[in-house]
Amino acid sequence: LKRVTRMLPALVALVAATACAAETVPAPRAQATPAAQAAAVVVPAAVTPAPSPSASPSAAPAKKIKLRIADITPMGEKTEKVGVGFPIIVTFDRDVKNRAAVEALLDVESEEPVEGAWRWVSARKVIYRTKTYWKPYQKVLFTARLSELPGNEGAKNVSRRFAVGAKNVSVVDTRKHTMKVYRNGKLAKRIPISAGKGGLIRNGVDVYLTTSGVHLTMGKKAVETMTSSWMGVTDPKDPRYYKEEIPWAVRISDSGEYVHQSAGYYQYLGRSNQSHGCVRATPAGAKWFYQITQRGDVVKITGTKRKLQWNNGWSYWQLNWTQWKKGSALKS
């Protein structure tokens, strides 16, 4: 394994909602399920035994803890496999005052060497991205040596191992109304689609247009409830109201974009763009795509005038490598 370590400062921007939004628009984040907890290996720092009643009053005080990790995304190797574009997202339990010192204690090792760097996106969150996609079918180990942070000697060191699966890269051409899915470099399937039709302007942004850029798959549901609440329409009597149960939904942004089975309107698939921003697919194509999807798979969308923002979901590949590294607290 080759150790790769880097880091970064932060920006977080608001993203326009898309009409295809589900009831719960925020990005899916890893929860501390039993399986996830099992995937995180906790390495305790040295512990000083408690003094006995006869101990001297000058015995060493309990070691201090001033920083812990609250969450790591994605899950570990025992819970899921991840795609070749996957980021490592680390959230701390409080604001990090000395980012450079903390970043220097975050290590990433991969079986297939690749350059990577951290980028701070908030006072508590830092994200690791590689310069090029991870190689498929390998293990990646993340370790946080927080007990080495001055004044934090009582903290526990934490590690998590990730398993990279197949290299899934999908290319959506909104002008030709097709999605080509490549697995390990070979074309596996061509799926007729219908993308966003445009026509609804919010704050100068046409939110009915699908965003063009490099997306990452963030999560998936066999059935997702999608409603009109994103635009403030909650009254069933309103002609604009809708609430639909959509099969085979794979999330690709924080602005409510999914690749999913079309709810009817099959006559438009492969012919014209008629959605509210999502990528609609045939029932068979959507189910197949859902089944092969791993979080961190790459979905490249082309052909629209609405550009994907780098901080819309996991769209970190929208920044070039020089831009990405500027977010690190460690200056080379």
Pin down the residues of each PLM region.
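Exported/periplasmic cell-wall-interacting domains
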Residues: 166-167, 209-212, 227-332
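Extracytoplasmic/secreted envelope proteins and their assembly/folding machinery
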Residues: 89, 103-105, 143, 190, ...
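Compositionally biased low-complexity segments at domain edges in trafficked proteins
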Residues: 170-197
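Electropositive
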Residues: 197-216
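Short, charged beta-turn/beta-strand-edge "cap" motif at the junction between a beta-strand
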Residues: 96, 146-148, 185, 223, ...
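Second-shell loop/turn segments in exported
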Residues: 76-79, 128-131, 204, 236, ...
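Acidic, low-complexity Ser/Thr/Gly/Pro-rich repeat segments typical of extracellular/periplasmic
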Residues: 2-11, 21-167
